[in-house]
Amino acid sequence: MKTSQNKSFLTCKDYTVSGENFELIYNDHQDILITQPQPSPEDLPKYYQSEDYISHTDASKKFSDKLYQGVKNVMLQKKVKLINSLVNSENKSLLDIGAGTGDFLKTAKQKNWKVRGVEPNSAARKLAKEKEIHLVEDISLISPEEKFDVISLWHVLEHIPDLDLQIEKFHSLLNRNGYLIIAVPNFKSYDASYYQEFWAAYDVPRHLWHFSKEGMVRLLESHQFLFQKTLPLVFDSFYVSLLSEKYKTGKSNFLKAFRVGMKSNLKAKRTNEYSSLIYVFKKA
């Protein structure tokens, strides 16, 4: 990724695993934030070794976990409805990157999608296998001859180290007129500005990149994708605010988190700066 006119934006703490501090550097050319220092590929897996890393488990121990799992079940249907609206054919194919425990692919498979998935975490792959969803560890294990109608990344792009290279790979794996769907946090949302360094969606150092709408569109258009639309993830502001309250105060202040999450969504009705956004791109 090219860098120019970089300046310090925030210092954030890893509240999930290490307790280490990381700098967020603003790149004005790309209109994104970059986590510094970025862990090496060898060190990165250790920052995911936590029972709190919910996307690699099906656990529902804490209230926030139960909230996450409950919302996830609602969103699975909405996600499949979205991909069905984009592709109208008998032999439709889907590749999900960072497939976690395979629930999205399982739901899509039930709606007659031919599904493939990539998930580096072995425990998550094992849980997916129990649902009869077989995932590969790395995208390099997907044959270049395989082509897909949709490639999806649900809160995954921000985790990928070699960003430009991987986006080129997605482009090559898509069918002509195929779609790339990306969901990521939005650092220009109200809840991000309210919580500042305590905003849970910064999630350093697992989140290596932090996107604005302008930055995301600029990045993907530079890789021969055509921007189609954004869609809001309205539940994210509540879940992220709940975690952020815990980081900021040490307490789970449900009422305060609800108020901040609601205010973020109400402001976003005017600005479209939701806590997280789904981007739909078409292969050019």
Task: Please state what every model-predicted region is.
Residues 228-256:
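Conserved catalytic loop of SAM-dependent methyltransferase domains
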Residues 161-165, 192:
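Short N-terminal helix/helix-N-cap motif within the alpha/beta-hydrolase-1
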Residues 154-161, 183, 206:
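Short catalytic micro-motifs in class I SAM-dependent methyltransferases
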Residues 2-8, 213-231, 256:
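A SAM-dependent methyltransferase catalytic signature shared across enzymes that methylate proteins
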Residues 1-154, 164-167, 232-233, 244-245, ...:
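Conserved N-terminal segment of class I S-adenosyl-L-methionine
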Residues 164-179:
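A short glycine-rich, Lys/Arg-flanked "PGG" loop and its adjoining helix->strand segment in the class I
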Residues 182-209, 214-219, 242-246:
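Short, glycine-/aromatic-enriched active-site segment of Class I SAM-dependent methyltransferases
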